[in-house]
């Protein structure tokens, strides 16, 4: 970290410094803003009635940030990395949205706190395992880490990260890990019952569950190879979209039958 902070920003001919810097800053800022609606022990910074929509909107904002971070340097590999993330997003976003909608439908609310409270009898992860698994894969994808680090692949000289240096590189790297942490924290109220648990206060259970999810995600990203983009896109549209669509229908039918 001290080395990155002390490094001079890279200057490229014809680079659009404004768009480049805007894209770099957008990624960590969007990650922090996404966490505002996550209840920690029953309390959220912003308890929005459309918290799930807010989280998803901040995640989609990252698309624009990374594309601008790839476009701004006016370099071929960086631009390829930016477009790779957009293509990756087009593959994972629809299954991810269906996974989010499944939890919201079961709780009959878009408020994240209401979704956590609706799981006192049984965690959504238990009877909606497809949505839970797809959501966790989506977290790795929008963090472009592990098997989904294709936008920053070695075959394109680190892609969207390749031309950044100094504080800009630090911001982008921080943004990736902030998104991973925010995604892990959001999984707790959506699928793991929030801060509910015996013997400990709600904030402690929220922290323990978040750390457990984060540890699992880090284990996966350290051990799985990069997924080829064409195979991932095909699998997402041919397999994940139908599966998550069926998963949405399960809570929808249960709600209608009440």
Segments (PLM) and residue ranges:
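Alpha-helical transmembrane segments of multi-pass membrane proteins predominantly involved
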Residues: 1-258
């Amino acid at each position: 970290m001290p080395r990155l902070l002390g490094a001079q920003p890279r200057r490229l001919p014809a680079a659009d410094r404004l768009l480049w810097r805007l894209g770099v800053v957008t990624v960590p800022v969007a990650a922090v803003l996404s966490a505002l609606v996550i209840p920690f022990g029953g309390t959220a910074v912003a308890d929005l009635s459309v918290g799930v929509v807010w989280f998803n909107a901040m995640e989609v904002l990252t698309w624009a940030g990374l594309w601008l971070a790839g476009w701004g340097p006016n370099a071929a590999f960086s631009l390829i990395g930016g477009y790779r993330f957009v293509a990756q997003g087009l593959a994972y976003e629809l299954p991810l949205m269906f996974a989010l909608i499944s939890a919201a439908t079961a709780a009959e609310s878009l408020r994240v706190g209401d979704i956590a409270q609706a799981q006192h009898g049984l965690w959504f992860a238990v009877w909606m395992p497809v949505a839970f698994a797809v959501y966790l894969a989506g977290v790795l994808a929008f963090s472009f880490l592990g098997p989904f680090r294709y936008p920053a692949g070695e075959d394109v000289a680190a892609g969207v990260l390749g031309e950044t240096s100094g504080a800009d590189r630090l911001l982008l790297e921080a943004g990736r890990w902030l998104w991973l942490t925010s995604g892990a924290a959001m999984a707790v109220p959506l699928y793991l019952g929030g801060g509910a648990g015996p013997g400990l206060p709600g904030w402690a259970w929220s922290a323990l569950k978040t750390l457990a999810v984060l540890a699992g995600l880090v284990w996966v990203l350290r051990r799985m190879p990069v997924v080829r983009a064409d195979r991932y896109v095909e699998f997402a549209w041919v397999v994940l979209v139908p599966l998550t669509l069926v998963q949405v229908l399960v809570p929808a039918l249960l709600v209608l039958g009440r």
